[in-house]
Amino acid sequence: MNIFLILGLVLSALIGLSLGLIGGGGSIITVPVLVYVLGVEAHDAVGMSLAVVGATSLAGSFLHYRRGTMHLKTALIFGAAGIIGALLGSPLTKLLSPSALMMAFGTLMLVVAILMLRRKSRTEGSDSDVPKEGLSFWKAVLAGFGVGVLTGFLGVGGGFLIVPALVMFGGLGMKDAIGTSLFVIFLNCIAGLVGHASQNQFDRNLTALVTVLAVSGTIVGTLLSHRIAAAKLQSSFAVFVLLVAVFLMTKNYGVLLGA
């Protein structure tokens, strides 16, 4: 078996593990794994990523719902706004070349890593999951719409944005935000996938294999999320995202200059 295929499958399980543990993060790694490890063309990888992350998030959200850490009402508000944003964002993918698309990923990941590290430092030492305040409906709608646009455009579920938005605008504690984020990601991915389905040809066998491993990872991650401090996981993952961002930007910067 090809060593890159083995590595890609291992990383697929880690993608699911991250989604289950911190309610995001794994989705932003899916496209780079598909492109640079499994050899999928960049535009096709965006659609495949939506399918993989959507199925994985649905499995994780179901487990969180059974544990009482998934708020359906809040998820539906974010999700409804996100669906509209994802449908509008999907056609924008074709406006960028593969190298430009990867540069956009790298830039977004760099911002995400910084935000995750800053949020970790602000919340460190507080594991409270008591809601802070009531749901701010219109702020939630605007935040959901913005995340949806990113989902459709770049093929990311947006959990790294949804979790802090749910804490700030949805009044949820960290663990509840993680569970709720997974269902919002699922809704956004379905909407984004509709926009990409008619534009791309997916390798169904590879998509199914990656999905099975990612779902397995998210089941394990969800079970572990109630035992491990999310702040510690978040800081480690932020460093990983930062390293991947530097790799993507370095690899594609020269290509764009020579275009």
Feature roles, as predicted:
Residues M1-L17, V31, Y36-V37, A42, ...:
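Juxtamembrane transmembrane-helix boundary motif
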